[in-house]
UniProtKB/Swiss-Prot annotation:
This is Fusion glycoprotein F0. Residues 522-565 are cytoplasmic. Sendai virus or recombinant F protein are widely used in cellular biology to fuse cells. Residues 1-25 form the signal peptide. Residues 117-141 are annotated as: Fusion peptide. It comes from Sendai virus (strain Fushimi) (SeV). It comes from the Viruses. The gene is F. The record marks R116, F117 as: Cleavage. Disulfide bonds join C70-C199, C338-C347, C362-C370, C394-C399, C401-C424.
Length: 565
C-alpha cells in the first residue's frame, strides 16, 4: 500500500512538472526579447487560505527555591527589568479590552462549559464604530478567551513543575506550548553549584544567566513584545515554539516541506501577545501558521520592457508588470496583496486579471499585435538582464565591451543587442559596467525582421499641471465667449435695441395721426358739398337714382307738353 501511494505521488509530481513546462513554453520569451520585452521563467502560485493556531506560554522567571534565599537578589533585579518591558504591554492590552467587547454565548453548569459561540459579537464602547484593526483585535480577544481556561491550567501547572517544556492540547486540538527556558539551568547547574562553590558564587552565575536570558528574550520575541499587533516570529522564536528544533515544524503542521520553507522565508508566521501576567511573570502569545494550497499548472511571470529600434526610431512595448499563465488562460496578475518567496507567490486570493486581446496575442508571440509607443525622452529603460547576460538598445545608448571599452555597433535591422560572457565579458551601458554570468548563453536565436502593432500614447499625465492648464483655458474661453456674445447682440439683433422700439412706436403714432386727419378732412369735404347742393337744385344732368319721370311731374313737364299740342 505504501509503495502504491509513493508511485501515485511520483506520477502526480511528473504530470505537474510536464504541465508546468507546457505552460512556460507557451510564452515565446526569446521572440519577445527581440522587441525588448523581458519575461522571466515564472514562479508557482499558492493561496494562503486558513491557518493553524498555536499558543506559547512563556514563563520568564524560573522557579528558584534555593537554600537560605540564595540568588533572591538577582531574581529581584531581573524582575525589575521584566517590569519595564511588560508593564506597557499589559496596559495596552487592558486599554484594548476596554475599547472592544466580545460577547460569547456561554452557559456554564457546575463549572463545565456547555456551549460556546466563537466571537459572536464584536462591538465598541468608546470608539462607536469598529475599524478593521479593532475587529482583528476583537477576534484575537475572542480566541484568547476561548483558550483562557486551558492556558490558565497550564500556568498553574507551570508554577508547580520543574520541567522546562510542557506541550499540551486544548479542547479543540490546538497545541499550547509552555516554555520555562531557564528552569533546566537552575535545576542542573545552580543547585549543584551551591554545595560546591557556595551561595555567593552560585548567585553570581545565576545573575549572569538571567541577564543573558533577557538579551535572548529580546532577540527572539522583541518585535512581539513591542506591540499588541501581529508581528512575524523570528527563527529563534520558532525554535522555541518547536522545542528548539526547527525541523519539527514538518511533523506538527499539516503541510508539505516546500510550504514550510515558503512561510518561513516570507515571514508569514505571525505572533500576537494576548495576555501578560505580572504576578507569575508569564506571557501568552497566539501564533498563526498559514496553510498554503498550490494552484496546479499556474505560473506568474515578471515582465518588463526596454526600448528597441526599428528603422532608426526608438519604440517601447507596453506589457503588464506580471503575467499569469494557465493551460487555457493568459492574463495579468495583481500581486499587490501577495508576498514573493524564492519559488512561489503567496496570495490571499486568485490574482488573475483580464488583459486586452491585443496584449494576449503579443505575449503569445504575435508582434504585429503589440501595442507600442514612440520614445521621446530618456526615462525608458535601455537594458535588462536576461539568461545570465544583458539585452540592451545600443542605438539609443552607449554600449562598450571588454576591459578595453570597445564600442558596440548595433545593426539597425535588429531591435536590440544580446551581450553575454561569451561575446563580451565586461559589459558597459551608459557608463554602468557589469560582468555577465559565466553560465549565461547567447539569446539571439530567432532574430528576424519584426513588425509591431499600432502606436499608442502611454506617456504619464501630470494631473495637477493639466488641471491648471484646463482652468486657464476655461478662463480665457470665458472672456472670449463674452466678447462673442456682445458682437452677436449687435449684429442681426437691431430690433431688440431700445432705440429701435421707441422709433417704431413714434412712427406708428404719426401714421395713426395722419390717418385720423385724412378721415376728418374727407368727412368735412363731403359735408360741405351736400350743404352747397340741396335736393331741389340738382341739375338735370346730375346722376340720381330717382327716375326722370318724377321730375317731369314736379317741374311742369306735362304742362309744357300739353301747350305744344
Amino acid at each position: 500500500m505504501t509503495a502504491y501511494i509513493q508511485r501515485s505521488q511520483c506520477i502526480s509530481t511528473s504530470l505537474l512538472v510536464v504541465l508546468t513546462t507546457l505552460v512556460s513554453c507557451q510564452i515565446p520569451r526569446d521572440r519577445l526579447s527581440n522587441i525588448g520585452v523581458i519575461v522571466d521563467e515564472g514562479k508557482s502560485l499558492k493561496i494562503a487560505g486558513s491557518h493553524e493556531s498555536r499558543y506559547i506560554v512563556l514563563s520568564l522567571v524560573p522557579g528558584v527555591d534555593l537554600e537560605n534565599g540564595c540568588g533572591t537578589a538577582q531574581v529581584i533585579q531581573y524582575k525589575s527589568l521584566l517590569n519595564r518591558l511588560l508593564i506597557p504591554l499589559r496596559d495596552a492590552l487592558d486599554l484594548q479590552e476596554a475599547l472592544i467587547t466580545v460577547t460569547n454565548d456561554t452557559t456554564q453548569n457546575a463549572g463545565v462549559p456547555q456551549s460556546r459561540f466563537f466571537g459572536a459579537v464584536i462591538g465598541t464602547i468608546a470608539l462607536g464604530v469598529a475599524t478593521s484593526a479593532q475587529i482583528t483585535a476583537g477576534i484575537a480577544l475572542a480566541e484568547a478567551r476561548e483558550a483562557k481556561r486551558d492556558i490558565a491550567l497550564i500556568k498553574e501547572s507551570m508554577t508547580k513543575t520543574h520541567k522546562s517544556i510542557e506541550l499540551l492540547q486544548n479542547a479543540v486540538g490546538e497545541q499550547i506550548l509552555a516554555l520555562k527556558t531557564l528552569q533546566d539551568f537552575v535545576n542542573d547547574e545552580i543547585k549543584p553549584a551551591i554545595s560546591e562553590l557556595g551561595c555567593e558564587t552560585a548567585a553570581l552565575r545565576l545573575g549572569i544567566k538571567l541577564t543573558q536570558h533577557y538579551s535572548g528574550l529580546l532577540t527572539a520575541f522583541g518585535s512581539n513584545f513591542g506591540t499588541i499587533g501581529e508581528k512575524s516570529l523570528t527563527l529563534q522564536a520558532l525554535s522555541s515554539l518547536y522545542s528548539a528544533n526547527i525541523t519539527e515544524i514538518m511533523t506538527t503542521i499539516r503541510t508539505g516541506q516546500s510550504n514550510i520553507y515558503d512561510v518561513i522565508y516570507t515571514e508569514q508566521i505571525k505572533g500576537t501577545v494576548i495576555d501578560v501576567d505580572l504576578e507569575r511573570y508569564m506571557v501568552t502569545l497566539s501564533v498563526k501558521i498559514p496553510i498554503l494550497s498550490e494552484v496546479p499548472g499556474v505560473l506568474i511571470h515578471k515582465a518588463s520592457s526596454i526600448s528597441y529600434n526599428i528603422d532608426g526610431e526608438e519604440w517601447y512595448v507596453t506589457v503588464p508588470s506580471h503575467i499569469l499563465s494557465r493551460a487555457s488562460f493568459l492574463g495579468g496578475a495583481d500581486i499587490t496583496d501577495c508576498v514573493e518567496s524564492r519559488l512561489t507567490y503567496i496570495c490571499p486570493r486568485d490574482p488573475a486579471q483580464l488583459i486586452p486581446d491585443s496584449q494576449q496575442k503579443c505575449i503569445l508571440g504575435d508582434t504585429t499585435r503589440c501595442p507600442v509607443t514612440k520614445v521621446v525622452d530618456s526615462l525608458i529603460p535601455k537594458f535588462a538582464f536576461v539568461n545570465g547576460g544583458v539585452v540592451a538598445n545600443c542605438i539609443a545608448s552607449t554600449c562598450t565591451c571588454g576591459t578595453g571599452r570597445r564600442p558596440i555597433s548595433q545593426d539597425r535591422s535588429k531591435g536590440v543587442v544580446f551581450l553575454t560572457h561569451d561575446n563580451c565579458g565586461l559589459i558597459g551601458v551608459n557608463g554602468v559596467e557589469l560582468y555577465a554570468n559565466r553560465r549565461g548563453h547567447d539569446a539571439t536565436w530567432g532574430v528576424q525582421n519584426l513588425t509591431v502593432g499600432p502606436a499608442i500614447a502611454i506617456r504619464p499625465i501630470d494631473i495637477s499641471l493639466n488641471l491648471a492648464d484646463a482652468t486657464n483655458f476655461l478662463q480665457d474661453s470665458k472672456a472670449e465667449l463674452e466678447k462673442a456674445r456682445k458682437i452677436l447682440s449687435e449684429v442681426g439683433r437691431w430690433y431688440n435695441s431700445r432705440e429701435t422700439v421707441i422709433t417704431i412706436i413714434v412712427v406708428m403714432v404719426v401714421i395713426l395721426v395722419v390717418i385720423i386727419v385724412i378721415v376728418i378732412v374727407l368727412y368735412r369735404l363731403k359735408r360741405s358739398m351736400l350743404m352747397g347742393n340741396p335736393d331741389d337744385r340738382i341739375p338735370r344732368d346730375t346722376y340720381t337714382l330717382e327716375p326722370k319721370i318724377r321730375h317731369m311731374y314736379t317741374n311742369g313737364g306735362f304742362d309744357a307738353m300739353a301747350e305744344k299740342r
